[in-house]
């Protein structure tokens, strides 16, 4: 009898712990009760990765590594590290999450820089190995702690992938003197390993809304074949440890070219696109809606 009681208790615990977890159901995102969840989100831009156009530094230091170089020239390595620590500590805080909840938001998309989680390939003592850093994970842990009491979902967005995912260095910290994500198998392997580690850490957290695998790729990738290959490799890594959370897929050309990325290769997947500097009319979405209807999947903007 004791074994039966323990088994029932475990089932109850797991079911209860995932009661708010999101998954796809046809063209909708729903919680575990089958209730549709319309994600109303905010992204703390500039928090984990400084983007020159946001920081108003484009004219002299567009990408984060360039901003950091200028600061080192100004005040040295030690003070620059202190500055970045204080920046991350104060740029986005519990007060911000409390305010977002009061304003009606129910999701936060966290733009992550890979170098807060692991070393660049150029700094690894042994090529091909991964040195893990707790800083990035601790930042996510903090947001989850702040968000959960407000029923706010946290979506993890790889904003700066190893090597950088596009020539627009301001948004992904690409350094043209080093191999990009698309020029280096070592960088791609590191990205897969990083996502697998992230998924393993948060696989049981119901307030993780999902994994946005690569933000705004913008690179000449014929037929998006390599992009799809990397997405599929990441998916395999994630699913090896986490069968539950949604996977968000952005197209090339700043998230909007999904050619070669359909049909879906996972049954819990959402296609994501970005929309800038245009009118807010239903007809403006005619180009993307066929993906939803043809493949019976949700879209996320």
Question: Predicted regions span which residues?
Answer:
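N-terminal carbohydrate-binding accessory modules
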Residues: 18-105
């Amino acid at each position: 009898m004791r074994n039966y009681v323990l088994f029932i208790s475990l089932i109850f615990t797991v079911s209860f712990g995932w009661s708010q977890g999101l998954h796809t159901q046809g063209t909708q995102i729903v919680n575990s009760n089958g209730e549709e969840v319309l994600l109303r989100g905010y992204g703390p831009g500039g928090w984990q990765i400084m983007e020159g156009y946001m920081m108003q530094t484009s004219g002299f230091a567009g990408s984060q590594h360039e901003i950091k170089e200028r600061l080192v020239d100004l005040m040295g390595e030690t003070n620059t590290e202190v500055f970045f620590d204080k920046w991350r500590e104060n740029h986005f805080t519990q007060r911000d999450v409390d305010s977002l909840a009061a304003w009606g938001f129910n999701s936060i998309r966290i733009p992550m820089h890979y170098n807060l989680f692991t070393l660049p390939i150029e700094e690894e003592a042994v090529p091909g190995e991964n040195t893990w850093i707790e800083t990035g994970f601790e930042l996510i842990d903090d947001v989850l702690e702040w968000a959960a009491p407000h029923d706010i979902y946290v979506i993890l967005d790889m904003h700066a992938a190893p090597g950088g995912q596009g020539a627009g260095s301001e948004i992904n910290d690409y350094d043209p003197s080093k191999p990009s994500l698309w020029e280096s198998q070592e960088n791609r392997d590191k990205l897969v390993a990083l996502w697998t580690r992230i998924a393993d850490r948060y696989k049981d957290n119901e307030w993780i809304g999902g994994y946005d695998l690569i933000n705004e790729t913008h690179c000449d990738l014929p037929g998006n074949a390599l992009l799809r290959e990397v997405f599929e490799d990441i998916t395999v890594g994630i699913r090896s440890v986490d069968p539950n959370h949604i996977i968000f897929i952005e197209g090339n050309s700043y998230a909007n070219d999904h050619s070669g990325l359909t049909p879906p290769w996972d049954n819990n997947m959402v296609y994501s696109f970005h929309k800038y500097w245009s009118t807010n009319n239903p007809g403006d979405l005619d180009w993307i809606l066929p993906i939803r209807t043809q493949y019976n999947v949700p879209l996320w903007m």
